[in-house]
């Protein structure tokens, strides 16, 4: 086990290291795997072999580059101005050489990338062989100390120093990486590179100029000797500055004439130096020109585009208003590009998952408020957001033209626009649309020409959705398509506009004739209470027992709405009158709970029974609503109101919690058991005792006496003095909440995810069910952690016999404040009624305890 844990830790460390390496954005720091192959960076290298892309090794390389900069200055300087080593330069040189000697040794342990296979080679023999036949000799020679070179030849000191310039290759690799690194500005990196090249060229030329003069047999006949007599006796600093001065004037082609070549050697060197300057100047000018042109290319392209658009408009005699729209759109496009708002180009370069996440973050909250998508699932909304395209429109530009083909619809993100009617020959503004409104949806959904021209009033940002893409998504989400269509029709009905009224009638006729491209189902027709459309769809062969995501069939919906014609049509086409939805509801119950007596009668005539559904749930619902008439109607139609719902809660449990004595009497007459436990172990008698319902307790005692039923208690459960089993905290479930706070079981979440199967049948459901005790009872600890504690409180100084049932606060201070507020005293003590013991900590209070508040007096 320990070995496995160690191996797991090593793998985790390796993954973390690789993740850290992969966090760099430089294009040159990673290896692209071949097609179909995994990344080579996931391959663990052999022992003592370092990856060339290792983060620590990259830091070492950066440190060596700093030493290379020193070498680039000191090597030409020592070659030109010094004949033998001088401290402190000689000491510094040896320290630098020592670091590069360490790098030579380290290179034998650094893997390399095979250019043919693009794999990292970690075989140390192959690494050594490749290094020995490539750079090893030059690296070794460049690290020979100056003192050793002097022993070979007194004239070899400067030459050995020049061999160290071999290290400059590291600087070139560094600049190549920096140019691709997003953390550094490309323009300034290129400028820094050009400056370094120029300074190095000037420095080398100055050292060579002085070397030629210093080694001449006649110092007076040299470029520096002609102006400075006995220049060898001048300070080293003065000689270096003079050499740099002549080198820079020659490079810049200024040529003041104060310094010039005197002897033949100097003339020859000057010729080649000026030829080199021609190439260097061309290189510098070319690079700077490229950088400047790149920075102004957008402006140049914009001017060319504007000029081309203007020429096109004049050549084709376009009206002034259309010309203005063209130029305004091009100017806006240039502005968005120059300000970094070219979002579509940026999004198109990203993977779909990242695009979807960005769109969800930016636009989901906006689309969630659009009337057309009210009530659709999160799945559909997420898919639609991912396909939205953001666009900018300048003021007074036409977004949609009247009577054009419906190819797109738009959602206004910000700005305002006008709906313009131009059918009459004169333009008239119908209404104004603002941020959050949708435009063009009628044409897209109904596949008819656009009703109005949409013209922006000021700068607008819109989200565009293509019709084909939209319909493809809807085809895969038929239930949501029904909701969208219903939202559209409801919106048209609420507008109270003559034009929209005609559109509504036309759409309803198209629906009835089945000429809509959207996938329509029977549930949609039942929701619309449209028996003509329902009949049309049934004649097409649609299954009358089809269900939505919650298992509700068209017959459920029609019965709930009381649409008798729709119910008769569905039954005529053999719809199942006893079909159940996901909550156990049947059409007969839907009609009963809404009070549609005619529909109830028709369903009963066609064989519908209340027992086909979850009668226990129906009875509890009637008890929660306090509807005794509905409860009697369940019994009238053959339902057993004593049956519990899935949680074990019966209608009697609920009636006791609601303190509905009449309903309790009726349920007892129907044979309800006062000792029947729910899944938490609570019986109706326990609830009546704990909640202090004296009338109900008396009713239970009378009923128990009549039936002579004795309550059997388990010895494993502690007994309270009241004679009621201590079953832990009773959970106030939605099934037995007061009716004023209860939400009907038929109300569903508007943003619920689509149900695929029952949760209880999933792995998570199985595991969750295992945590519930088989006998439905919970220990004291479980009751305290899973549910709040309820206690009965009373005051010793008040005439309060029954007390009040409250939830136990979280602290003793809050408990004292609760007692003070409830009884109008300054409570300072809390005692347990059972043993008269004073309590000073809420942790010792159990569920069901009776607490007495008292003052110091």
Swiss-Prot record:
Quaternary structure and interacting proteins, as annotated: The potassium channel is probably composed of a homo- or heterotetrameric complex of pore-forming subunits. Possible heteromultimer with AKT2 or KAT3. Part of a K(+)-channel calcium-sensing kinase/phosphatase complex composed by a calcium sensor CBL (CBL1, CBL2, CBL3 or CBL9), a kinase CIPK (CIPK6, CIPK16 or CIPK23), a phosphatase PP2C (AIP1) and a K(+)-channel (AKT1). Interacts directly with AIP1, CBL10, CIPK6, CIPK16 and CIPK23.
Residue spans crossing the bilayer: 62-82, 91-111, 135-155, 159-179, 194-214, 266-286
Topology with respect to the bilayer: Multi-pass membrane protein
Record PTM: Phosphorylated by CIPK proteins CIPK6, CIPK16 and CIPK23. The activation by phosphorylation is induced by low K(+) conditions and stimulates K(+) uptake and relocation. Dephosphorylation by AIP1 repressed the transport activity.
Domain notes for this protein: The segment S4 is probably the voltage-sensor and is characterized by a series of positively charged amino acids. The pore-forming region H5 is enclosed by the transmembrane segments S5 and S6 in the Shaker-type (1P/6TM) and contains the GYGD signature motif which seems to be involved in potassium selectivity. The KHA domain (rich in hydrophobic and acidic residues) present in the C-terminal part is likely to be important for tetramerization.
Keyword NAD applies: no
Protein name: Potassium channel AKT1
GO molecular function: identical protein binding; inward rectifier potassium channel activity
Domain KHA span(s) in chain numbering: 790-857
UniProt cross-references to InterPro entries, sorted A to Z: Ankyrin_rpt (IPR002110), Ankyrin_rpt-contain_sf (IPR036770), cNMP-bd_dom (IPR000595), cNMP-bd_dom_sf (IPR018490), Ion_trans_dom (IPR005821), K_chnl_volt-dep_EAG/ELK/ERG (IPR003938), KAT/AKT (IPR045319), KHA_dom (IPR021789)
GO cellular component terms attached to this protein's record: monoatomic ion channel complex; plasma membrane
Taxonomic path: Eukaryota, Viridiplantae, Streptophyta, Embryophyta, Tracheophyta
Pfam families: Ank_2, cNMP_binding, Ion_trans, KHA
Intramembrane segments: 242-261
Gene Ontology BP annotations: potassium ion import across plasma membrane; potassium ion transport; regulation of stomatal closure; response to salt stress; response to water deprivation; root hair elongation
Topological domains, Cytoplasmic: 1-61, 112-134, 180-193, 287-857
Residue spans of the ANK repeats: 515-546, 550-579, 583-612, 614-643, 647-676, 680-709
Induction notes from the record: In roots, strongly reduced after 2,4-dichlorophenoxyacetic acid (2,4-D) treatment and weakly reduced after benzyladenine (BA) treatment. In shoots, strongly reduced after abscisic acid (ABA) treatment and induced after benzyladenine (BA) treatment.
Species assigned in the record: Arabidopsis thaliana (Mouse-ear cress)
Keywords recorded for this protein, A-Z: ANK repeat, Cell membrane, Ion channel, Ion transport, Membrane, Phosphoprotein, Potassium, Potassium channel, Potassium transport, Repeat, Transmembrane, Transmembrane helix, Transport, Voltage-gated channel
Sequence positions that bind a nucleoside 3',5'-cyclic phosphate: 372-493
Subcellular location: Cell membrane
């Amino acid at each position: 086990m320990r070995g496995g844990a160690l191996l797991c830790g090593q793998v985790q460390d390796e993954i973390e290291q690789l993740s850290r390496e992969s966090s760099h954005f430089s294009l040159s720091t990673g290896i692209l795997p071949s097609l179909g192959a995994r990344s080579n960076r996931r391959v663990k290298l052999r022992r003592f072999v370092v990856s060339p892309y290792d983060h620590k090794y990259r830091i070492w390389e950066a440190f060596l580059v700093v030493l290379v900069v020193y070498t680039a200055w000191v090597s030409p300087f020592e070659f030109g101005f010094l004949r033998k080593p001088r401290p402190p330069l000689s000491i510094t040189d040896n320290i630098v050489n020592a670091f590069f000697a360490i790098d030579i040794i380290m290179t034998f342990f650094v893997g390399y990338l095979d250019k043919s296979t693009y794999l990292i080679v970690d075989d140390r023999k192959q690494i050594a062989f490749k290094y020995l036949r490539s750079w090893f000799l030059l690296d070794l020679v460049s690290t020979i100390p100056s003192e050793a070179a002097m022993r070979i030849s007194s004239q070899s000191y400067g030459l050995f120093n020049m061999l160290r310039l071999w290290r400059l290759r590291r600087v070139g690799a560094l600049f190549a990486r920096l140019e691709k690194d997003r953390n550094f500005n490309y323009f300034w990196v290129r400028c820094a590179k050009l400056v370094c090249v120029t300074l190095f060229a000037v420095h080398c030329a100055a050292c060579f100029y002085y070397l030629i003069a210093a080694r001449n047999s006649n110092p007076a006949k040299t470029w520096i000797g002609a102006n400075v007599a006995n220049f060898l006796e001048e300070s080293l600093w003065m000689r270096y500055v003079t050499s740099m001065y002549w080198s820079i004037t020659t490079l810049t082609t200024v040529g003041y004439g104060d310094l010039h070549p005197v002897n033949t050697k100097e003339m020859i060197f000057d010729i080649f130096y000026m030829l080199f300057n021609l190439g260097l100047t061309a290189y510098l000018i070319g690079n700077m020109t490229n950088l400047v042109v790149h920075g102004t290319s957008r402006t140049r392209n914009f001017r060319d585009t504007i000029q081309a658009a203007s020429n096109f408009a004049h050549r084709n005699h376009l009206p002034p208003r259309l010309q203005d729209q063209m130029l305004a759109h091009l100017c806006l496009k240039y502005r968005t590009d120059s300000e970094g708002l070219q979002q579509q180009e940026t999004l198109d370069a990203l993977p779909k998952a990242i695009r979807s996440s960005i769109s969800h973050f930016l636009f989901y909250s906006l689309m969630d408020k659009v009337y057309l998508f009210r009530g659709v699932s999160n799945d559909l909304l997420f898919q639609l957001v991912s396909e939205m395209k953001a666009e900018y429109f300048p003021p007074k530009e036409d977004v949609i033209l009247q009577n054009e083909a419906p190819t797109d619809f738009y959602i206004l993100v910000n700005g305002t626009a006008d709906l313009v009617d131009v059918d009459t020959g004169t333009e008239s503004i119908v209404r104004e649309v603002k941020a959050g409104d949708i435009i063009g949806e009628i044409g897209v959904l109904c596949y008819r020409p656009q009703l109005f021209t949409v013209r922006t009033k000021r700068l607008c940002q819109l989200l565009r959705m293509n019709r084909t893409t939209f319909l493809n998504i809807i085809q895969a989400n038929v239930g949501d398509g029904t909701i969208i269509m219903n939202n559209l029709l409801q919106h048209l009905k609420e507008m109270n506009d003559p034009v929209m009224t005609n559109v509504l009638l036309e759409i309803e006729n198209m629906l009835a004739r089945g000429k809509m491209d959207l996938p329509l189902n029977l549930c949609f027709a039942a929701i619309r209470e449209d028996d003509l459309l329902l009949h049309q769809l049934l004649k097409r062969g649609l299954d009358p027992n089809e269900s939505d995501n919650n298992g509700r069939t068209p017959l459920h919906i029609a019965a709930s709405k009381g649409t008798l014609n729709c119910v008769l049509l569905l039954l005529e086409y053999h719809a199942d009158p006893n079909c159940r939805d996901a909550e156990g509801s049947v059409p007969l119950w839907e009609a009963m709970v809404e009070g549609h007596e005619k529909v109830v009668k028709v369903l009963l005539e066609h064989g519908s029974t209340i027992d086909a559904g979850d009668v226990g749930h129906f009875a509890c619902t009637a008890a929660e609503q306090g509807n005794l008439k509905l409860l009697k109607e369940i019994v009238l139609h053959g339902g057993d109101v004593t049956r519990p719902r899935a949680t074990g809660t019966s209608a009697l449990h609920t009636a006791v919690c609601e303190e509905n004595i009449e309903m309790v009497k009726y349920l007892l007459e129907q044979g309800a058991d006062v000792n029947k436990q729910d899944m938490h172990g609570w019986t109706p008698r326990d609830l009546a005792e704990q909640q202090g319902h004296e009338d109900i307790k008396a009713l239970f005692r009378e009923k128990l006496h009549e039936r002579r039923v004795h309550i059997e208690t388990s010895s494993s459960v502690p007994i309270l003095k009241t004679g009621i089993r201590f079953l832990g905290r009773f959970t106030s479930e939605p099934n037995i909440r007061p009716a004023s706070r209860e939400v009907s079981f038929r109300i569903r979440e508007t943003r619920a995810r689509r149900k695929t199967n029952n949760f209880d049948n999933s792995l998570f459901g199985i595991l969750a069910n295992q945590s519930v005790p088989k006998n439905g009872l919970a220990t004291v600890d479980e009751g305290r952690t899973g549910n709040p504690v309820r206690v009965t409180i009373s005051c010793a100084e008040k005439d309060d016999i029954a007390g009040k049932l409250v939830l136990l606060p979280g602290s003793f201070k809050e408990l004292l404040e609760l007692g003070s507020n409830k009884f109008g005293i300054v409570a300072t003590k809390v005692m347990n009624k059972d043993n008269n013991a004073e309590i000073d900590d809420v942790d010792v209070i159990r569920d069901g305890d009776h607490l007495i508040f008292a003052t110091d007096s």
